[in-house]
Amino acid sequence: AEAVDRLFDSVESELGTVDVLVNNVGAFAPSHWEALSVERWREVMATNVDATYLCCRRAVPAMREAEWGRIVNVGYAGSEKGLVNPKNAPYFIAKTGVLLFTRMLAADTTDDGITVNAISPYVVDTSDAFPEDAPRGRWASVDDLVAVLEFFLSAAAEYVSGENVEVDGGYLPETV
């Protein structure tokens, strides 16, 4: 919590009140859930769920006071479909928690001029991605995610809250 407070204090001293918040955090634990230490499990949960909660907890009061704000959380495309892999269980469970938190926060702030939504990619193109497995011959690009983010932050999405857009190239509906 102290690190989040320091971050917000720094941003607010340089830029003013936070009225747009994008929670893009993630920690993996690519190991079978039974083989994980409790400490690693908690670290993945803290990075994915707690950090999102703490940043929202810090940003929402000022957004409520301003009667305007935009929050976009980053989830995982498999969460809505119940995709779970025992070899990375804490990540899947944590990102599902982020989506549930998104919906709860959207309901709680709906009368305050704040929208809360989520973007959920499957795989974003990195050097670790395997293009031969990708739908449409490629994984999602950062530009694919930015397009959805820009929509959520635009006036066109003023009445959109509590939603999740999966950016998966149609891959997950085929696999679940």
What are these regions (language model features)?
Residues 19, 27, 34-53, 68, ...:
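Catalytic Tyr-X3-Lys loop
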Residues 61, 107-108, 158:
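Alpha-helical segment proximal to the catalytic Tyr-Lys
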Residues 4, 32-33, 40-42, 130:
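Substrate-binding pocket helix/loop in short-chain dehydrogenase/reductase
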Residues 110, 115, 160-162:
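Short, small/polar-rich loop/turn modules that mediate ligand/substrate recognition or access, typified
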Residues 72-97, 102-103, 107-111, 123:
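Catalytic loop of short-chain dehydrogenase/reductase
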Residues 56-57, 103:
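A short, exposed helix-loop element centered on a Lys and neighboring polar residues
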Residues 134-145, 156:
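A conserved structural motif in NAD(P)-dependent oxidoreductases
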Residues 161-176:
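Short C-terminal tail/terminal secondary-structure segment
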